[in-house]
Every structure is written in C-alpha cells, then in structure tokens.
From Swiss-Prot:
Modified residues (Phosphoserine): S120
Protein name according to UniProt: Plasminogen
Protein's GO biological process: blood coagulation; fibrinolysis; proteolysis; tissue remodeling
Domain notes: Kringle domains mediate interaction with CSPG4.
Organism: Canis lupus familiaris (Dog)
Site (Site of substrate specificity): D277
Domain of life from the UniProt record: Eukaryota
C-alpha cells in the first residue's frame, strides 16, 4: 500500500521498476543500453536513484520515470498511483507528543510527526517564514500578518508532514495555495485553501476546532509548536514544542502584565516568569490544548511584547471566537 506517491512523485522512494509499457527500467548507475551523464547516483545523491527504481529527480510534471532497457526508447514514465487518505480522527496524533514541561527554557525538540497538523508556510521558492495549522484536508489556518508580503496565492506554498525545516524528508507533501481569505474584522487570522486536498496519513492529520466562543479555562496547559526561526533561537531546524499555561484575560490585562491591551478575541499564554514563549513557535502556528481525548486548536500565534520576557505572556488569536467565520468560509468555498 505504501508504493504510492504524493503530488508529482519527486519524493517517491518505492520499488516500481517497469515503465507504463511494461519495459524494465535501466539501473540509474548503468550506462547501457543508454549512456547518460545526468541523473546518476553521483550527480543526484539526494534523489534516491537506487537500483532501477522509477524516480522523479527533475520534478517532471508527468511523474516518476526511468531510462529503459529498450535500446530504441531512452526513457519512459512509470505508473505509480497517488497515495490515498487514511481516516484518522482530528486532533489525535499517531505518535505520542513528548509534552516536555514548560520549565525547559525554550521548549524542546518535538518527537517527529507528533504534531501532525503543523504546517510550514513558505515562499514559492521554499523558504519557511510562518507556521500554520491544517484544520481539514483542504484548509489551513494561519495569522493574517503572515500574508502581508503578497495578496497572490501563487506567492505561497504549504509543506505538510515535515519534521526538519530544510533537507525535507522524501514523504513530505508540498501543496500550492489556491486562495487566501482574511478575517473581515481585521483580526490576525486567515484561511488558506489548498489547490488540492492534503493526503491524510499518520504524519498529516488536522487539528480539531473548538466549539464557537468556547473559553479555555485559566491555567490550562497547552502546547505551541514551530520551527522557531522568528528570533534567531535556532532549533537546529527541527520542529520544537513548548508547554504553556493559558492565563485568563482578566489576569493578563493587569497593570503588571499586558495592562489592558488584550482583547476578548485574543488569549494569553506563557510562564509569567519568562523563558518560554512563541519565539519558540512561529507566527501563524498553533496553540493546541488537550481535552478529553484530543488536541483542539485554541490559539493562533499572533504577537508578544519582546521574547520570553518575564511578565509579558504571548498573545494568540482566540480561535473559538472565529469558528463561525471559519466554518462559513469552508462551507461556501
């Protein structure tokens, strides 16, 4: 069942070794029947050009191919099926999260794929600049300020199922953005519709949305995740997590903390002693809280005063206040 591909199959590492016409593939390292100087294990060490398996080292839109054993046919495509979604419940990772306590300054590196709704929002050239959360196969929630650089969907792409920020694993999914939706009252929240649905796998699972207007109780322990490149605390490019308590708005708005700046459509979280904060996360990334048996997306990383400073908790968009808007956009688009 795993002998399938995502997208154009650039990351395909399966064992298919015949073309659509049934001709066996030539080994990538061999020079007969066809001599070739490009696409050998030496020229493309990252492309998985082992034995004579079908591969897509050049990202050909028609998918994986190989040089053939027929002297009259240099290369041909292979018939590799698209992977199909498995059904997993929202908010239930297939890998148990580490849940490292918030006393760890700056959080810790996450267990790979334990936060499977975390996405990386990238420029079209592949540079990571914001986080986001998969909330259904076709929809990602992020911060509106992440989309200030361009109003064109083509400027962005989404990477799903990643643990490393660079040197992406071969089975990550890379999907173009079809449309952007900014929240109409100018809240720092936005929806991205993907140009094709994500394939739901054990590494790519949506987070659950909260009930409308739900209020997370004071001192609930929640988790933020991200590659944390926002402030130069370099997590060696691996996904990080940090545990943070939610602070009720009444407390957060006290003079010694955020002094009345937090709106009812926002939520505070952080250790009032400082040390962990969404500098470790990413703008637009998730704040999730475990409830009963699943993780619920309660916050979108929005702003903070400085970074992990004492008495200055991070501020998140309160997702529950926008669930009605989110569900409406998803239903009508």
């Amino acid at each position: 069942a795993s002998d399938c591909m995502f997208g154009n199959g650039k990351g395909y590492r399966g064992k298919k070794a015949t073309t659509v016409m049934g001709i066996p593939c030539q080994e990538w390292a061999a020079q007969e029947p066809h001599r070739h100087s490009i696409f050998t294990p030496e020229t493309n060490p990252q492309a998985g050009l082992e034995k004579n398996y079908c591969r897509n080292p050049d990202g050909d839109v028609n998918g994986p191919w190989c040089y053939t054993m027929n002297q009259r046919k240099l290369f041909d495509y292979c018939d590799v099926p698209q992977c199909v979604s498995t059904s997993f419940d929202c908010g239930k990772p297939q890998v148990e999260p580490k849940k490292c306590p918030g006393r760890v300054v700056g959080g810790c590196v996450a267990n790979p794929h334990s936060w499977p709704w975390q996405i990386s929002l990238r420029t079209r050239y592949g540079k990571h600049f914001c986080g986001g959360t998969l909330i259904s196969p076709e929809w990602v929630l992020t911060a509106a300020h992440c989309l200030e650089r361009s109003s064109r969907p083509a400027s962005y792409k989404v990477i799903l199922g990643a643990h490393k920020e660079v040197n992406l694993e071969s089975d990550v999914q890379e999907i173009e953005v079809y449309k952007l939706f900014l929240e109409p009252t100018r809240a720092d929240i936005a929806l991205l519709k993907l140009s094709s649905p994500a394939v739901i796998t054990s590494k790519v699972i949506p987070a659950c949305l909260p009930p409308p207007n739900y209020v997370v109780a004071d001192r609930t322990l929640c988790y933020i995740t991200g590659w944390g490149e926002t402030q130069g605390t370099y997590g060696a490019g691996l996904l990080k997590e940090a545990q943070l308590p939610v602070i009720e708005n009444k407390v957060c708005n006290r003079y010694e903390y955020l002094n009345g700046r937090v709106k009812s459509t926002e939520l505070c979280a952080g250790n009032l002693a400082g040390g962990t904060d969404s500098c470790q996360g990413d703008s637009g990334g998730p704040l999730v809280c475990f409830e009963k048996d699943k993780y619920i997306l309660q916050g979108v990383t929005s702003w903070g005063l400085g970074c992990a400073r004492p008495n200055k908790p991070g501020v998140y968009v309160r997702v529950s206040r926008f669930v009605t808007w989110i569900e409406g956009i998803m239903r009508n688009n």
